[in-house]
Every structure is written in C-alpha cells, then in structure tokens.
C-alpha cells in the first residue's frame, strides 16, 4: 500500500498538479517533475500532449486503467447529452468515487480498499465492487465494523475536501445519499481537469 501511495504522489508531480488537493502532496514543495532532470521544469506541450496529460489526470484521479477509462468514454459518447458531462457523471457514480467524494476516506485508493474489503453497503446490501454504479436515491453506508478504522476516523475528523452538492452526507451514521448524477461543473475538483481535452483525446 505504501508503494501505491508513493506512486500516487509521483504521478501528481509528473502531471504538474496537486491532483487530489492534499496538503501533504509533495508537489506543494517540489513543483517539478520527478527524476534526474526534473528540476529543469515542465516542457511546453503540443496539442496532443495536453490531451494526453488531461486523460492521464482522469486515470490517476479515479484510479482506473486506460482500458476502463476508454470504455467509460465510449458509453458516455453513445449517450445523449454532453459527452464530457456524461463521462464525469459515470465516473462520479462509481461506488469508490461516491465514498471518496463524500469525505468518508482520505483518498480514492482507500475508498477502493474499503469497498473491496466489504466494508460498504448500498441500500443495506454489501457491495465489494469499486466500479459498481450508484443510482440517484441510493444510500451508501460504511459498515459499523469499519467505523473505527484509522483512515475513516482521520477523514471524518479532517474534512479535507468540500462535499459536492449531489451528495447528502451524514457523518454520524457514515452514510451518504446519492442525490443526482453530476455534470462536470458540479464536481469540485481540486485541480483543473479539462474534460474537454479528454473528449478530444478519444475522439481524435
């Protein structure tokens, strides 16, 4: 797990942004790429380069593979409405994303771990699939046996992130009601995610 966290922060520096908005992100004090020549700074990117970085941001932020992100995009593209909004709505509807965005855990990695270890229920039923799609009206809750886990207690105490309006969180019950599928503009990303460039990347 430590190795995963280290790679996470390395990705933040590689992409040139404090991706998760965390105060302890090394990018806050070392805002240059990792590696031997990192101190030389970030290179100016081509149009494709900017698109590629934007798609990498989404991969890292939501902890999904290239294949997973592409599949989500294809579904968003085929759906009526704005493709960027559809993409973000689908990613934010993932169970791990709901747990993370609600502030019940400190990171997306810990959200995936909490779900995978059967510590989360949806409408009273245990769901251990991080990619499970939550629907408006669903109630997501951390099980009592996990309520005293250090990562849960730390997240509730710190309240490090602003909870988006599409989630109704009860910190005492460690539960969250999913009110609606959000659009890109509804999600308080700590970094500039440029979903339009992700759409261009996959549409090119």
From Swiss-Prot:
One of its GO terms (biological process) is translation. The keyword rRNA-binding applies. Pfam families: Ribosomal_S4 (PF00163), S4 (PF01479). Residues 93-156 form the S4 RNA-binding domain. PROSITE patterns: RIBOSOMAL_S4 (PS00632), S4 (PS50889). InterPro entries: Ribosomal_uS4, Ribosomal_uS4_bac-type, Ribosomal_uS4_CS, Ribosomal_uS4_N, S4_RNA-bd, S4_RNA-bd_sf. SUPFAM superfamilies: Alpha-L RNA-binding motif. One of its GO terms (molecular function) is structural constituent of ribosome. Keywords: Ribonucleoprotein, Ribosomal protein, RNA-binding, rRNA-binding. It comes from the Bacteria. The keyword Transferase does not apply. GO terms for cellular component: small ribosomal subunit. PANTHER family: 30S 40S RIBOSOMAL PROTEIN, SMALL RIBOSOMAL SUBUNIT PROTEIN US4M. Part of the 30S ribosomal subunit. Contacts protein S5. The interaction surface between S4 and S5 is involved in control of translational fidelity. Belongs to the universal ribosomal protein uS4 family. One of the primary rRNA binding proteins, it binds directly to 16S rRNA where it nucleates assembly of the body of the 30S subunit. This is Small ribosomal subunit protein uS4. It comes from Anaplasma phagocytophilum (strain HZ).
């Amino acid at each position: 797990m430590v190795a995963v966290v280290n790679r996470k922060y390395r990705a933040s520096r590689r992409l040139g942004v404090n991706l998760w908005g965390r105060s302890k992100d090394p990018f806050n004090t070392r805002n240059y790429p990792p590696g031997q020549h990192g101190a030389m700074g970030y290179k100016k990117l081509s149009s494709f380069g900017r698109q590629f970085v934007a798609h990498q941001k989404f991969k890292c932020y939501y902890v999904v593979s290239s294949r997973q992100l592409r599949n989500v995009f294809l579904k968003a593209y085929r759906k009526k409405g704005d493709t960027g909004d559809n993409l973000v709505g689908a990613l934010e509807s993932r169970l791990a994303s709901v747990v993370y965005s609600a502030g019940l855990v400190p990171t997306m990695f810990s959200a995936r771990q909490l779900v995978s270890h059967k510590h989360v229920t949806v409408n009273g039923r245990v769901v251990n699939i991080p990619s499970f799609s939550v629907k408006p009206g669903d109630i997501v809750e951390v099980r009592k046996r996990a309520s005293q886990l250090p990562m849960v207690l730390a997240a509730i105490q710190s309240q490090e992130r602003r909870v988006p309006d599409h989630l109704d969180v009860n910190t005492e019950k460690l539960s969250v009601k999913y009110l609606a599928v959000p659009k890109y503009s509804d999600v308080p990303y700590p970094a500039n995610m440029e979903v339009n460039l992700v759409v261009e990347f996959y549409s090119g």
